[in-house]
Amino acid sequence: MSWTRIRLELARGPDHPEGSHRIGYELSLPLDTKGRLAVSVFRELPELCTIHRQREDSDERVGTLKHHRGDHWVFAYGAPDALEENLPRFGQHRFQVGDYISVLDDHGHDHTYRVVSSVPAPGLAHARMGASS
């Protein structure tokens, strides 16, 4: 298991034929050896699983990954009734460069993002070791 910083950018689609590097997410997640979310570590330290949403219109938000029943994952921003973006099959996705991730926005529109970087986050690894000491 390793803590990883992941950059997702909007993939090509009808509204953005070339995709967009200005629309995306920066994620800090624990990944297993197959590049998938390490759910057991998430359960221990959910507060370290952070999301930074970036948009062209400067509607940037910071939030956390949340898990509901089954394989229902969301990006949550703030209060319990605040914006949530649904993540179909999030627990099954790999987060390796070139892989694709789907995000359903708060209006129910499906957007596809491509993993453009996935690098170790040693600071988070130290936080984890400190938390378990």
Annotate the PLM regions.
Residues 11-17, 51-52, 60-62, 99-103:
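Intrinsically disordered, low-complexity boundary segments flanking structured domains
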Residues 5, 72, 100:
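Exposed beta-strand and adjacent loop surfaces of beta-rich binding modules
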Residues 76-129:
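Short, compact, well-ordered microdomains
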Residues 9-11, 28-32, 68, 76-78, ...:
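A structural detector for beta-sheet-dominated domains
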Residues 1-42, 50:
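N-terminal intrinsically disordered, low-complexity, charge/repeat-rich segments that act as generic
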